[in-house]
Amino acid sequence: MSEQFHLGVVHDGDIATAVIHGDLDADTVPRLRAAVSGLLSNGTMHITLDLKEMTFVDSSGLGAIVDTARSLRAAGGDLSLVNPRPSVRRIFQLTSLDDALRTAAGEQA
């Protein structure tokens, strides 16, 4: 069972920061996809996913993050990932997604 998932979004100009709370897995990915779809349809081109409260990510969650990055790049935007927990960072490293996605240990400057 997934840890209670919720997503908080804060806008700062043309950048949206989405803080993921809980597990990003097959049960919760549709909620992330819906939120990203809403941001894209509103013209948001730069999204930062703050992972400090994300407790777990499975393959469907990784796929959703990769799909988000591809969609934004195709539209001329970008995706940044910040503050992953060590266990989540390790998953990105094991899957080589840390090289494919822009990931930062701390808040972006």
Predicted regions and their residues:
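STAS-like cytosolic regulatory interaction modules
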Residues: 1-56, 67-109
